[in-house]
Amino acid sequence: MNATLAESLWSGLAVSRVQQVLAVLVGTLALAISAHIQVPFWPVPMTMQTFVVLMIGAAFGARLGAATLVTYLIEGTIGLPVFASAAGLAGPTAGYLVGFLVAATLVGWLADRGHGRSVLTTLIAFVIGEVIMLGMGAGWLATKVGLAQALSLGVVPFLPAEGVKIALACALLPTLWRFARR
């Protein structure tokens, strides 16, 4: 049985470096697009990035998911317009960006071990990923505005939307797995 959704979709094929590079590029494109689908909050905009980050981890696994997020962070660092705000790793959202890498890698590690194939395991993996992203984001933001403000500006407003994104993933991932097994 294939460990990740990407491997399952490519089953019967030797997964080449070209396919892996293509997956990374598609993943970074999805992240860049999702960064610009936003509801403008300050200092942290609400985007679809967290959903895409977790889906990348769940679909690609730890290694390819981490490679995708490292590539994305490099793209933003060298000036490509892929981040939600121009400040990127120098601004108030830096903790979230680093949290994206950690969350995608951990969710990918869980996916490598079979999480994400059922509603329950998807829920567990994605809640862990969300805690990492919001925790690291708020931790960095707290160095700028204090812990109480970081929680009220960088966590609490996002909880309802993150819940909806997790529910969407809980419906989508097991369905994709059923499709991939055919």
List each model region and its residues.
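Helix-loop junctions at the membrane-solvent interface of multi-pass transporters
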Residues: I33, I37, A59, I78, ...
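Hydrophobic alpha-helical transmembrane segments
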Residues: V21-V26, F51-M55, G65-T71, T93-V98, ...
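Alpha-helical transmembrane segments and their lipid-water interface positions
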Residues: G65-Y72, G79, F83, A103, ...
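Interfacial loop-to-helix junctions that mark the boundaries of transmembrane helices
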Residues: A14-S16, W42-T47, A87-G95, L123-I124, ...
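Short helix-perturbing small/polar motifs within transmembrane alpha-helices
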Residues: N2-G12, Q19, V26, I33, ...
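Membrane-embedded alpha-helical hairpins and interfacial helices in multi-pass inner-membrane proteins
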Residues: H115-R182
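Hydrophobic transmembrane alpha-helices
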Residues: M1-A59, R63-A66
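Interfacial aromatic-anchored transmembrane helix boundaries in multi-pass membrane proteins
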Residues: A35-P45, T71-A103
